A protein has these predicted regions:
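Amphipathic alpha-helical
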Residues: 1-39, 233-240
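Classical protein tyrosine phosphatase
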Residues: 1-21, 75, 84, 115-118, ...
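Domain-scale segment recognizer with a strong primary affinity
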Residues: 12, 41, 99-100, 109-295, ...
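Eukaryotic intrinsically disordered and solvent-exposed regulatory patches
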Residues: 27-30, 47-50, 58-60, 88-91, ...
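An active-site-proximal beta-strand-loop segment
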Residues: 37-72, 266
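Short small-residue beta-strand/loop micro-motif enriched in glycine and branched aliphatics
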Residues: 70-75, 128-130
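Active-site beta-loop-alpha junctions of metal-dependent nucleic acid enzymes
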Residues: 74-95
């Protein structure tokens, strides 16, 4: 009797779609594999739009963050089109630093399009997409977004018409500040040296040794600080993963399983918190699932913490 009552309640469709979950969201914390060197894995994202365009006509910021060094490149733009994203990626990164091995973006049309697909495929760049409404997948950029937006708000005028004038200075300050996790500045990790600040006093002329001596020294320095930063980051990831995963379910779904999907867009007080049931049609590891709505035929990728299992109701005769 107890088991049948428990199953009857757990399998209630309306309850599953509307109830507030009082437990931790499912899914263990799994970090993206840390690259061995800088500028191998990049994260790119758009921020905006601001309420009104600046006097220069800009409403968006496009941001590129290196996964290992945390080095940031950012520009203010009037739009968030595929053309703007592709032009920024080529002119501001590839023509300066070469092609990365992997690029991670969201699944918006400004990144998921024929133009950027042609660029990445021609340069042998693996282009990975974060799942819908799950910014944690592209968390490197999201963390910088939170940092620089607050700084822009403090410096721009009350009409917010000149915010883009301060963007380069804020990016420079970020790149030359010691990162709390890596314990080095992003600039130092990216280029194996500290930048000369505009406020530094004039120093005597530095005489460098011959290139055949200095270059091996520079390479050794890069290897040492990169290895140290990787150790610091991996230690931090391990520590927080252990804390996050404690007492947290890590469900695994299989193709054919029925699930509800968390509603992440605007909803009113009486709207369902989850939609479905939908069916899992493809898996990617243990955290990302391609889910299909059989009524509309629409498919989309979701993170495991956006899914809720459908409990089959037992029938007793």
């Amino acid at each position: 009797m107890r088991a049948s009552i428990h199953n009857y309640i757990a399998s209630c469709t309306q309850c599953a779609r509307h109830n507030i979950l009082r437990t931790k969201s499912p899914g263990h914390l799994k970090s993206i594999k840390l690259p061995s060197d800088v500028f191998q894995v990049l994260h790119m994202d758009f921020w905006g739009p601001v309420r009104t365009a600046s006097t220069r006509g800009n409403r968006y910021v496009i941001i590129l963050t290196d996964n290992l060094s945390k080095y940031v490149i950012a520009d203010a733009l009037p739009d968030c089109t595929a053309k703007s994203a592709a032009q920024f990626f080529i002119e501001r990164f590839i023509l300066h630093h070469g092609a990365p091995e992997r690029l991670i973006t969201d699944n918006g049309t400004h990144f998921n399009n024929h133009l950027l697909r042609a660029i990445t495929s021609s340069m042998n760049i693996a282009h990975a997409f974060s799942v819908s409404y799950h910014p944690q997948t592209n968390g490197q950029v999201e963390r910088f977004n939170a940092t620089f937006a607050a700084q822009l708000a403090k410096y721009c005028d009350p009409e917010q018409s000149d915010w883009d004038l301060y963007l380069p200075s804020i990016v420079y300050a970020y790149n030359t500040s010691i990162h709390s996790i890596a314990k080095f500045t992003p600039y130092e990790l990216a280029f194996a040296r500290s930048p000369k600040s505009p406020f530094d006093s004039t120093s005597p002329i530095l005489i460098l040794p011959p290139a055949h001596i200095f270059y091996p020294y520079l390479q050794r320095t890069r290897r040492l600080i990169t290895a140290k930063a990787r150790t610091n980051i991996l230690h931090h990831q391990s520590y927080w993963a252990q804390r996050y995963n404690q007492n947290r379910r890590d469900p695994v779904y299989r193709v054919g399983d029925l699930v509800y999907v968390q509603v992440s867009t605007d909803r009113t007080k009486l709207d369902a918190r989850r939609l479905g049931p939908f069916i899992v049609i493809q898996t990617s590891g243990q955290q990302h699932y391609l889910v299909k709505d059989n009524l509309t035929g629409r498919t989309d990728w979701y993170h495991v913490n956006q899914l809720y299992p459908v409990i089959e109701r037992h029938h007793y005769y």
